[in-house]
């Protein structure tokens, strides 16, 4: 059998995630979320990459907590994740710093038609993997400390650090939703 291979683009750097939809290809390339139009779906770009969001930090000493995990939600928003060691202040290009959304480990989403971004939850260390159940509820994993979480918009989850929440009105940070840990809780998490 003949194998078909096509290179859509090789003009991006730091690619951590790819998602197709809404007339093109979406690329998470920290510090930016890029969109390359492909309106007819022929796997040939219809234009240059467009920066849709920016402000995702790139930690120099920790290459596993980058913004990642693009996935279309059942609500038509594009969802993504960002690790704790790569905090940022995200927004559409040109957004002044005081109007940007801080993210320090958490889940965010972007609406492609309205061109708005929301940070839904903070406090996770290294979120990798998320999906929706049959009721449209979002669940995600965290590869350090607690590992199964139910996304509740506005939540600040308990993570390994004791840093303050981005939201000054948070009463208490939420624990994981799994019924067990993936380390011996009688010891420190890294032993």
Give the location of each predicted region.
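Beta-propeller domains with acidic blade repeats across secreted/periplasmic ectodomains
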Residues: 1-191
């Amino acid at each position: 059998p003949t194998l078909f291979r096509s290179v859509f683009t090789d003009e991006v750097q730091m690619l951590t995630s790819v998602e197709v939809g809404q007339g093109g290809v979406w690329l998470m390339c920290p510090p930016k979320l890029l969109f390359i139009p492909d309106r007819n779906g022929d796997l040939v770009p219809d234009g240059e990459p467009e920066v849709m969001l920016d402000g995702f930090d790139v930690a120099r000493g920790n290459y596993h907590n980058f913004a990642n995990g693009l996935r279309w939600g059942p609500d038509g928003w594009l969802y993504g994740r960002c690790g704790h060691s790569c905090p940022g202040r995200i927004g559409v290009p040109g957004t002044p710093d005081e109007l940007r959304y801080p993210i320090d480990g958490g889940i965010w989403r972007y609406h492609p038609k309205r061109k708005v971004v929301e940070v839904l939850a903070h406090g996770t260390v290294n979120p990798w993997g998320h999906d929706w159940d049959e009721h449209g509820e979002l669940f995600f994993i965290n590869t350090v400390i607690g590992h199964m979480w139910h996304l509740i918009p506005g939540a600040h989850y308990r993570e390994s650090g004791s840093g303050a929440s981005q939201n000054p009105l948070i009463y208490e940070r939420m624990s994981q939703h799994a019924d067990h840990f993936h380390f011996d809780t009688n010891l420190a998490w890294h032993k």
